[in-house]
């Protein structure tokens, strides 16, 4: 009997905030497994804001575009069901996988697939989709590798209650920095103060008052801006940057729904005047060099890392579209209904 899988595709390019009708679930046949490839059973998928940029017609060129009819992909956790390559059946892997169901997903055996080797103190599989996965790697790469906060420095983290931002806050804390965080709701700001211990929280949905609030929270300026939001928040951060300060540019979420290419803040030239440094970065390509060090450091962090788990492949559009409502805290993932030793707890 022919083998098939279910896979989410882009039905049309979203206009503004995506809705469920922008995606379509299709059954796809799977050909016989070629030599050198593995057949994967997907157990969990990461849901991330950057995916919105892949649906835009231009800009954001570091990842392939998704046009109408294109199958979607995400960072995922999977088990090797069959192998005609160097990896063993039954092994667990993480990597960029099709947004497809748990039955049979065939992918090549590239270096982008990483073996599952969670530290013994962190045995839960959902952790590979959050702090031990691409989300944690993004926060670690931006904050620890590029930002390098020092004891006593003042660090601003925007979108700080999200998956990447909340981990970036904790990495800055671990380095001994004084952390100011922005978030878009009172509940998020309370969580950041009470659970993550930031010294001040700012409302990033109040562009008129943000600059004044930041000046009150950091009267002597900030040394490092971990920027994920853009817009008025980014502009205000540049204005408060101290001489020789740094900006680590992780993302510009406020512009992700805009079909036009991303725009720089009007005061970007101030960086030159103060001897500041702007470090934009993307994750692809960093894994081979830094993955092992990242895993070792994250194992010792034991972060506060809430998971928002939705169940079933059918929930993927709802999970993705819900990212942009501004209500979630922590990391959103989709767990597929595979039965295994890793299924009991997440």
Q: Residue ranges of each PLM-predicted region?
A:
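NAD(P)H dinucleotide-binding glycine-rich loop of Rossmann-like/cofactor-binding domains
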Residues: 72-79, 86, 91-159
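Glycine-rich phosphate-binding loop and adjacent beta-alpha segment
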Residues: 232-302, 337-346
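Short amphipathic alpha-helix with an adjacent loop that forms part of the alpha/beta core around
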Residues: 208-219
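C-terminal hydrophobic helical "lid"/dimerization subdomain
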Residues: 3, 287-346
């Amino acid at each position: 009997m022919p083998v098939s899988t279910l896979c989410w595709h882009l039905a049309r390019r979203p206009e503004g905030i995506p809705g469920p009708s922008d995606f379509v679930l299709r059954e796809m046949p799977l050909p016989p497994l070629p030599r050198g490839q593995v057949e994967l059973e997907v157990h969990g998928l990461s849901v991330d804001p950057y995916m919105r940029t892949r649906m835009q017609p231009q800009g954001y060129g570091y990842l392939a575009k998704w046009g109408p009819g294109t199958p979607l992909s995400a960072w995922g956790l999977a088990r090797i069901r069959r192998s005609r390559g160097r990896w063993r059946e039954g092994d667990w892997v993480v990597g960029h996988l099709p947004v497809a169901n748990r039955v049979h997903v065939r992918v090549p055996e590239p270096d982008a697939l990483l073996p599952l080797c969670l530290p013994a103190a962190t045995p839960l599989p959902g952790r590979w989709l959050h702090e031990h996965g691409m989300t944690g790697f993004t926060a670690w790469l931006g904050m620890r590798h590029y930002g390098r906060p020092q004891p006593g420095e003042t660090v601003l983290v925007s979108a700080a209650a999200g998956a990447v931002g909340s981990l970036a806050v904790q990495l800055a804390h671990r380095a001994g920095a004084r952390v100011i965080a922005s978030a878009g709701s009172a509940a998020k700001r309370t969580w950041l103060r009470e659970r993550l211990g930031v010294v001040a929280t700012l409302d990033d949905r109040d562009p008129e008052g943000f600059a004044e609030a930041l000046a009150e929270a950091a009267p002597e300026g900030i040394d490092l801006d971990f920027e994920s939001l853009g817009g008025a928040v980014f502009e205000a951060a540049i204005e408060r940057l101290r001489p020789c300060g740094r900006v680590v540019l992780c993302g510009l979420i406020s512009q992700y729904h805009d079909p036009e290419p991303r725009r720089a803040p009007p005061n970007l030239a101030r960086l030159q005047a103060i001897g500041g440094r702007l470090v934009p970065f993307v994750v692809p390509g960093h894994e081979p060099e830094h993955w092992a060090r990242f895993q070792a450091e994250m194992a010792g962090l034991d972060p506060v890392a809430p998971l928002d788990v939705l169940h079933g492949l059918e929930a993927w559009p709802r999970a993705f579209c819900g990212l942009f409502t501004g209500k979630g805290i922590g990391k959103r993932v989709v767990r597929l209904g595979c039965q295994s030793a890793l299924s009991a707890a997440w």
